[in-house]
Design a protein with these regions (language model features):
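A charged N-terminal "starter" segment
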Residues: 2, 8-14, 18-151, 156-170, ...
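Active-site loop/helix belt of alpha/beta enzymes
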Residues: 32, 178-324
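Conserved, mostly hydrophobic/aromatic
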Residues: 66, 90, 112, 144, ...
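General beta-strand structural signal in soluble alpha/beta enzymes
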Residues: 87, 108-111, 131, 152-155, ...
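Flexible loop/turn segments at secondary-structure boundaries
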Residues: 93-96, 118, 137, 160, ...
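Short acidic, glycine/serine/threonine-rich loops at helix termini
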Residues: 98, 120-121, 141-143, 162-165, ...
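Glycine-rich, aromatic-flanked loop segments that form ligand/cofactor-binding clefts
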Residues: 167-181
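Charged (often Lys/Glu-rich) extended helix/loop segments that serve as interaction or gating elements
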Residues: 291, 299-459
Length: 459
């Protein structure tokens, strides 16, 4: 069935930028912009080789890209002697990937008991763990304390809570919420005043004084004011805010500020036309603020921490899927063996993820499709009105930038089973780093019930 409503300029632009498929109505490309390329890190031949061992759908990670990116980050902040990246485990909780990041000098940012368990199993402990939680259960706080992790308190009342359920360590971090609206230039980035996280400055002062009275010797400051910023200015701007706060807190309490944690928020260019963040420029911007604000106050020993998740892994992950069906009705639909249970972001946020049809990277993008999964929900769509090459049943499709908040946000709605995870190693070989769920996994929590014997017969 022929596609309708395709302008010549949309086809032409796709030809000029091989592999580009993002001519959605309203996109810069469809308005006459020349998009940048966004290429997969595997070829069709590589994908087919992996599929022989691991059926689609599966999440695939690029070890080479992950390591190179971690090294660029560490280089960008090498001017700060205490610098450390604490990878946000929530983004991609896989021990094989955590070990790669550990080998590149990273710690882990945990927010739950199970994330702490996973990190401990990977060999992280002490100052290699930052525990940032909210509405925190007692067992989680105790686990973090027992691991000697840096504990980041979200609320003033957590000072007493920490003392009651665990104890008071020598170093404690407190999370700051400035309230109001956070803007960059004329753009409103987020609304901290509506956020459930953190303490006001007045509460920070009170928390520091209480903690000092209980024996705390070193303090950290943490804040998260915006998510997925594609701007080299966010971290330097946040650093300026937190460095000035550090000076004020030091003067108000006499506390030794050991570190400032810039948390996450540095994003990735999900769309081909978006400019990528330059981490070297970002690091230099933070250094400028450091030298202008902290050094003159005699606070040049403050360490800089980051808690990047998306920036560390998103571009180095693909969701690899096979085309199962085509449907021709009022629109043209391509049905994949992956669904929102494998990648929630498009359905949950309306988020854009680039799509490449492997083996057709240089074909004209002259067909308009909705690319869907098989959930019984109409928002189970990876792309709407997306310009792509002609797609056939059996084609292998790569959904880009799924290395963070991809597998980790998966779920079992409709009885869907979570997919496997595979590592593309530096030498080009591949390794299974998480097997796919089975029906036995899905029904395991009924193993106590009278229904279990009949279920077990079907495995």
């Amino acid at each position: 069935m022929p596609n309708r409503g395709i302008s010549p300029i949309m086809v032409l632009l796709c030809n000029k930028a091989p592999g580009i498929d993002c001519c959605e109505p309203g996109d810069k490309q469809s308005r006459g912009w020349i998009a940048m390329e966004k290429k997969p890190f595997i070829t069709l031949a590589q994908a087919q080789e992996i599929i022989q061992d691991v059926p689609t759908p599966f999440h695939l990670y690029d070890e080479k890209g992950i390591r190179e990116n971690a090294r660029r980050l560490n280089q960008a902040f090498s001017w700060n002697k205490g610098y450390k990246e604490y990878f946000a485990v929530k983004a991609t909780p896989n021990p094989y990937l955590l070990k790669i990041l550990q080998e590149e000098g990273c710690g882990v940012d945990c927010s739950s008991y199970t994330e702490l368990m996973l990190s401990q199993a990977c060999g992280f402990s002490g100052s290699d763990i930052m525990f940032s939680s909210n509405v925190t259960p007692a067992q989680d706080m105790k686990k973090a304390y027992d691991l000697n992790a840096y504990i980041n308190l979200d609320d003033l009342t957590h000072v007493e809570f920490l003392e009651q359920v665990a104890g008071i360590p020598e170093t404690v971090c407190c999370r700051y919420n400035p309230g109001g609206v956070f803007s960059m230039g004329n753009d409103i980035m987020d609304n901290p005043g509506d956020s459930k996280y953190g303490m006001s400055e007045e509460q920070m002062v009170e928390a520091y004084k209480k903690l000092m009275a209980k024996g705390v010797k070193h303090f950290g400051i943490h804040a998260f004011l915006a998510s997925n910023t594609v701007s080299n200015e966010y971290y330097p701007m946040l650093a300026g805010i937190l460095f000035k706060l550090a000076v004020r807190l030091h003067k108000a309490t006499g506390a030794h500020i050991a570190f400032v944690n810039l948390s996450g928020g540095v994003g990735v260019d999900y769309r081909p036309e978006q400019p990528a963040n330059d981490i070297q420029v970002i690091g230099e911007g933070v250094r400028k603020q450091f030298e202008e604000i902290l050094v003159p106050e005699g606070m040049g020993d403050v360490a800089i921490f980051t808690e990047l998740g998306r920036f560390m892994l998103a571009p180095y992950g693909h969701l690899v899927s096979t085309v199962l069906h085509q449907k021709h009705i009022y629109k043209e639909y391509i049905g994949l063996d992956a669904c929102a249970a494998n990648l929630m972001r498009p359905a949950m946020y309306g988020a854009y993820h680039h799509i490449t049809v492997l083996g057709k990277e240089n074909a004209p993008c002259d067909h308009k499709y909705d690319v869907t999964g098989g959930l019984c929900e109409n928002n189970d769509k990876f792309a709407v009105d997306r310009m792509l090459p002609e797609i056939n049943i059996g084609d292998v499709v790569v959904i880009h930038d799924t290395g963070a908040h991809g597998f980790s946000m998966g779920y079992n709605y409709n009885g869907k089973l979570r997919s496997a995870e595979v590592l593309l190693k530096e030498d080009g070989s591949h390794e299974l780093i998480r097997r796919a769920e089975t029906p036995a996994d899905y029904f395991a929590t009924f193993d106590f019930s009278p229904f279990w014997p009949e279920l077990e017969k079907q495995f």
